[in-house]
């Protein structure tokens, strides 16, 4: 049955200050009475004696401080009974407490509502309308228990995702471990009901003890709860714990948004941003203020804003107004973009992503990849062996054919070096006719044979000279064309290299400027903080100095005598409480009233 009860009332930070005061006083072999405790709290922590007394009485009611009657054994109070205060010892069984003492939401004491399933307690005002108590006769479950009860998730899959989150929690919890290592403090368990830290959370993740993401989130919130209770809401440790919890909630939100993106962004395989998700993200052209349109994936939409993640090197996230979003099918020439090297790389990544979409290529787990690789390797090895077997006989047969007919093929002419666009000149037809006619007359007589040989030699020389001139001209033209093409290619390469260098220099310049601005801002903040602290110290010193001067003036004023008639500094004494600054004032006061009340002996 649900019920409201006051578990504790004292402030946790005040309790720790009181513990320190009692411990210091006891170490000095003195009784920790109310006077010594109030003096210590006023001197060290600036707490008013009335507030100290109130917090001390509440701590006694909460059982966090033990009150006894002690008899003094030395000094002015020897033999006199006086109230003394002690730290609680091990006689109290703290392990039997089933519920926390402080609200899980605001971390403060007071009247709380107790959960029937777990150790958590809440103030009624800290609960939303959905979780507030409706009927006191029925059992009540806290928001954490209700959220854990709703979810059912694959443990193996959840463990993979939670390991990424825990690894980031460990990185961010380094400062928390440096700043706060008091969980071994003897009084730690008097304030913290259920202790937890990042190594404990990691161990539970590795052992698969979490049943849902909400249960993991509850442990992260418990870490924040314990830190605020033990170190205080305004402590540096509490700020680190808040940041750790906020980052953990952000990681869980990203996981719920898209599990594929969350896994790939943490595992970071090659081309991880190009793999399609299930379901696929909408592809758009997004335009940030001060930049042109850039290819991006839509992560979520909220009101008139669109959360996108850009293609490119850094894969940055941004909220873009919906009017600055264009569909990916829009013609790129209508967008008027500046085609820098970074933009081209982003478009290349977009094309690869679209190709993966067309091919239905999704990211697979390591076990599936190993199976496919083994199958492919076995198939490739078998095909390579078959290829070797089929190729070896062909090579031997070719060698036998070459040994039988070594000179069957004629050498190719030099015209093979000319490109296919050139026209190769042919031999003149009349020369071929002369050579044929002379060859047919060889059988008739020897004198015509000699004439034919001389004619053929002359014609062959003329043909060779004509071919040489034409081929020389063709090769010269081809050489000039190659030079011009080479020049144009060189200019293009140089131009692209200059553009790349310019874009890289602009990027480095922008990063340097941003870094310098951030450093200057940090330095300015540090200087402002120093100036504020210095002004505050000077102000306090000035107040102390003025108070001292005022006290001295009051003391000097009290030591003087003053005229009863005009209140100026007196010079003439009349009687026990009457003095005057001049004879005139004495006479005026004497005739007015003093002659009837003067006690001076005459």
Swiss-Prot record:
Binding sites annotated in the UniProt record for Zn(2+) 2: 574-575, 594, 598
Binding site for Zn(2+) 1: 563, 566, 581, 585
Ranges where the record places region Disordered: 366-459
Listed Polar residues bias regions: 435-459
Subcellular location: Nucleus; Chromosome
Position of the Glycyl lysine isopeptide (Lys-Gly) (interchain with G-Cter in SUMO2) cross-link: 366, 407-408
Tissue: Ubiquitous.
Single biological process term from Gene Ontology: negative regulation of extrinsic apoptotic signaling pathway
Domain PWWP residue range list: 280-331
Chain span(s) of sequence motif Nuclear localization signal: 394-400
Segments of this protein annotated with the region Interaction with human adenovirus E1A: 452-572
Keyword annotations of the record: Bromodomain, Cell cycle, Chromatin regulator, Chromosomal rearrangement, Chromosome, DNA-binding, Host-virus interaction, Intellectual disability, Isopeptide bond, Metal-binding, Nucleus, Phosphoprotein, Repressor, Transcription, Transcription regulation, Tumor suppressor, Ubl conjugation, Zinc, Zinc-finger
Ranges for domain SAMD1-like winged helix (WH): 6-82
Main location (coarse class): nucleus
Zinc finger MYND-type: from-to: 563-598
Lineage: superkingdom: Eukaryota
Zinc fingers typed PHD-type, residue spans: 100-148
Subunit structure: Homooligomer; forms homooligomers via its C-terminus. Interacts with histone H3.3 trimethylated at 'Lys-36' (H3.3K36me3). Interacts (via MYND-type zinc finger) with NCOR1. Interacts (via MYND-type zinc finger) with MGA protein (via PXLXP motif). Interacts (via MYND-type zinc finger) with EZH2. Interacts with EMSY and E2F6. Interacts with PIAS1 and UBE2I.
Disease implicated: A chromosomal aberration involving ZMYND11 is a cause of acute poorly differentiated myeloid leukemia. Translocation (10;17)(p15;q21) with MBTD1.
Protein name as catalogued: Zinc finger MYND domain-containing protein 11
Lineage, opening ranks: Eukaryota, Metazoa, Chordata, Craniata, Vertebrata
């Amino acid at each position: 049955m649900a019920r409201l009860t006051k578990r504790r009332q004292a402030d946790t930070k005040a309790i720790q200050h009181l513990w320190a005061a009692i411990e210091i006083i006891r170490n000095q072999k003195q009784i920790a009475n109310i006077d010594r405790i109030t003096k210590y709290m006023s001197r060290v922590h600036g707490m008013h004696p009335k507030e100290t007394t109130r917090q001390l009485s509440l701590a006694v009611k909460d059982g966090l401080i033990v009150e006894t009657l002690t008899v003094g054994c030395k000094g002015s109070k020897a033999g006199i009974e006086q109230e003394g205060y002690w730290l609680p010892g091990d006689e109290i069984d703290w392990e039997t407490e089933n519920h926390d003492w402080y609200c899980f939401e605001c971390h403060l004491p007071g009247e709380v509502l107790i959960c029937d399933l777990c150790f958590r307690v809440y103030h009624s005002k800290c609960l939303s309308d959905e979780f507030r108590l409706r009927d006191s006769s029925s059992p009540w479950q806290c928001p954490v228990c209700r959220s854990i009860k709703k979810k059912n998730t694959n443990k193996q899959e959840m463990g993979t995702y939670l390991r990424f989150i825990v690894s980031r929690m460990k990185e961010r919890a380094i400062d928390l471990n440096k700043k706060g290592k008091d969980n071994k403090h003897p009084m730690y368990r008097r304030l913290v009901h259920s202790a937890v830290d990042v190594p404990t959370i990691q161990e539970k993740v590795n052992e698969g003890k979490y049943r849902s993401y909400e249960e993991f989130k509850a442990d992260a919130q418990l870490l924040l709860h314990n830190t605020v209770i033990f170190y205080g809401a305004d402590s540096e440790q509490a700020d680190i714990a808040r940041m750790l919890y906020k980052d953990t909630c952000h990681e869980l939100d990203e996981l719920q948004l898209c599990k594929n993106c969350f896994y790939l962004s943490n595992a970071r395989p090659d081309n991880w941003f190009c793999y399609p998700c299930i379901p696929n993200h909408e592809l758009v052209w997004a335009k940030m203020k001060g930049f042109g349109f850039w290819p991006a994936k839509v992560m979520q939409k909220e009101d008139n804003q669109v959360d996108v993640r850009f293609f490119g090197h850094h894969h940055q996230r941004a909220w873009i107004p919906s009017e600055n979003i264009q569909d990916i099918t829009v013609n790129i020439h209508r967008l008027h973009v500046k085609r820098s090297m970074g933009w081209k790389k982003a478009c290349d990544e977009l094309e690869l992503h679209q190709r993966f979409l067309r091919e239905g290529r999704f990211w697979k787990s390591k076990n599936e990849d190993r199976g496919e690789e083994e199958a492919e390797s076995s198939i490739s090895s078998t095909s390579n062996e078959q290829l070797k077997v089929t190729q070896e006989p062909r090579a031997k047969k070719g060698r036998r054919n070459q040994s039988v007919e070594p000179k069957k093929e004629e050498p190719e002419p030099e015209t093979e070096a000319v490109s296919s666009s050139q026209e190769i000149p042919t031999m003149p037809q009349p020369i071929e006719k002369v050579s044929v006619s002379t060859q047919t007359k060889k059988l008739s007589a020897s004198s015509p044979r000699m004439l034919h040989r001389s004619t053929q030699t002359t014609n062959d020389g003329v043909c060779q000279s004509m071919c040489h001139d034409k081929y020389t001209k063709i090769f010269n033209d081809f050489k000039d064309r190659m030079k011009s093409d080479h020049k144009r290619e060189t200019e293009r390469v140089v131009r692209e290299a200059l553009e790349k260098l310019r874009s890289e220099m602009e990027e480095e310049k922008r990063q340097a400027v941003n870094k310098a601005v951030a450093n200057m801002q940090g330095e300015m903040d540090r200087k402002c903080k120093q100036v504020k602290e210095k002004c505050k110290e000077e102000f306090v010193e000035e107040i102390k100095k003025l108070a001292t001067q005022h006290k001295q003036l009051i003391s000097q004023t009290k030591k003087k005598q003053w005229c009863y008639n005009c209140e100026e500094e007196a010079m003439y004494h009349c009687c026990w409480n009457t003095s005057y600054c001049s004879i005139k004032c004495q006479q005026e006061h004497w005739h007015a009233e003093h002659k009837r009340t003067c006690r001076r002996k005459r």
